[in-house]
Amino acid sequence: MWNVIESDKIPFSPYPKGTANIKRIAEQKTVGCKRFTGFGLLEIPPGGVFPEHTHPDREEIYYVLSGSGTIIVEDKEISAKEGLAVYVSGEHPHGIRNQTDKPLTVLFVHVQI
């Protein structure tokens, strides 16, 4: 199985909590993959927050594409800037804050454990 995804045709939408926007480029329900559960982008505006959350059934990787901010994992605050990647085992609370005056764009990947 394979799929071509025209991500430029997929809009960002408000994330239900916090102040981030999310673009869900590929998910199990949209591309039919089995263990790969999500791939997309987060746009966190200046002063915005992608709230802390957990998902014990999935692992996640964040990759900062542009901007800077803080990635929180448990009680650790990680200074995030372009090119930084962070792996999180989903049972650990994690989220992202943008305390700057420029947008922060983060690529995320979820894989089912």
PLM regions and their residue ranges:
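A short, N-terminal "cap"/entry segment at the start of jelly-roll beta-barrel domains
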Residues: 1-37
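Short, conserved beta-strand element in jelly-roll/cupin
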Residues: 41-45, 55-71
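Conserved short histidine dyad/triad with adjacent acidic residue
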Residues: 24-28, 40-55
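A short hydrophobic beta-strand segment most commonly corresponding to one strand
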Residues: 87, 102-113
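Structural motif
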Residues: 68-70, 77, 93, 103
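Short acidic-glycine-tyrosine-enriched beta hairpin
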Residues: 75-90
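Asparagine-centered strand-capping/turn motif at beta-strand->loop junctions
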Residues: 96-99
